[in-house]
């Protein structure tokens, strides 16, 4: 399985580029974030013509998530249990849920496409919402793996957190001043490791960014952030054979400000030897 995650920053504006990437790179599963359209406005036909099944969840011109797959998509889940909502200027348990999470099972692998709240500012209510959202996701992850420890599970997407100083090359992103690098955000990200997940790309690609702001020549100066991740359970991580960060997708006409992150997986190595092909020297 070749799995990719990409914050496409408006799928309708970049549908040709997104589909072309998926086909060219032989992507089996593509998790997309910031599709920026309602569910019914998603360009399903372009993906289907290229041989993909698609599920999407969008409410308006903001946020939105989707999963495209070569294989059938099963057990689709919109949002996760305990996921908080948000509405500016309001508090309480019944706030509207944003289009930030969609999960599905593909060939026995549970995949989530996630667009974590930005946080906006350290003194903004959106920052508290971000931390609450991450905590709810962590609890759901723990519950899922406690019920099925051998499940190949992947949390993929834009986490809006640079977990280490090496993941921050943007001079305007400063600890104590801006979001994405605050100790509480980094602790929330690290908590997924305690929940049983591993950043499956970092051991193979220890450095490099996945996002560069459109402003102030951030990309030519390579002043980016590493905020897009594939976090996998033990059963998922053990199957990872390779990884890629497609920096060139930030080039060209009307690029997204994010680039795709790819993991190559082979689940057959866990099968009985009798089921594996024999190779003779």
Where do the PLM segments sit?
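N-terminal, active-site-proximal structural segment of metallo-dependent hydrolase catalytic domains
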Residues: 1-65, 271-281
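Surface polyanion/phosphate-binding segment centered on an Asp-His-Pro turn
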Residues: 244-281
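Active-site-proximal loop/helix segment associated with metal-binding centers of metalloenzymes
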Residues: 110-129, 170-186
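Active-site beta-strand/loop signature of hydrolases that rely on acidic residues for catalysis
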Residues: 3-7, 18, 22-40, 111, ...
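Structured beta-strand-rich core segments of catalytic domains in phosphoester-bond hydrolases
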Residues: 35-38, 42-121
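Conserved beta strand-loop-helix elements of the APE1-like EEP
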Residues: 61-76, 218-238, 265
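Active-site-proximal beta-strand elements of phosphoester/diester hydrolases
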Residues: 1-10, 108-123, 258
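Metal-dependent phosphoesterases centered on the DNase I-like endonuclease/exonuclease/phosphatase
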Residues: 50, 133-227, 276-281
């Amino acid at each position: 399985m070749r799995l990719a995650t990409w914050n496409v920053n408006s799928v309708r504006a970049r549908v040709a580029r997104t589909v072309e990437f998926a086909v060219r790179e032989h992507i089996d599963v593509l998790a997309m974030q910031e599709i920026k359209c309602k569910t019914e406005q998603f360009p399903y036909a372009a993906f289907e013509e290229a041989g993909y099944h698609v599920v999407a969840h969008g409410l308006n011109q903001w946020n939105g998530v989707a999963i495209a797959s070569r294989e059938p998509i099963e057990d689709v889940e919109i949002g996760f249990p305990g996921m908080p909502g948000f509405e500016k200027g309001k508090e309480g348990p019944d706030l509207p849920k944003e289009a930030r999470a969609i999960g599905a099972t593909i060939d026995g692998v549970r995949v989530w496409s996630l667009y974590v709240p930005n946080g906006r500012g350290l003194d903004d209510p959106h920052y508290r919402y971000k931390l609450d959202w991450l905590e709810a996701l962590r609890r759901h992850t723990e519950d899922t793996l406690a019920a099925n420890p051998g499940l190949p599970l992947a949390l993929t997407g834009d986490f809006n957190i640079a977990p280490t100083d090496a993941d921050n090359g943007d001079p305007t992103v400063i600890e104590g001043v801006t979001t994405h690098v605050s100790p509480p955000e980094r602790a929330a990200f690290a908590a997924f490791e305690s929940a049983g997940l591993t950043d499956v790309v970092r051991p193979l690609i220890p450095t490099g960014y996945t996002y560069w702001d459109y402003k102030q020549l951030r990309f030519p100066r390579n002043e980016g952030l590493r905020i897009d991740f594939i976090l996998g359970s033990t059963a998922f991580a053990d199957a990872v054979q390779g990884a890629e960060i497609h920096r060139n997708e930030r080039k060209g006409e009307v690029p997204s400000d994010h680039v795709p992150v790819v993991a190559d997986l082979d689940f057959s190595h866990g099968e009985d030897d009798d089921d594996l092909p024999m190779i003779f020297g």
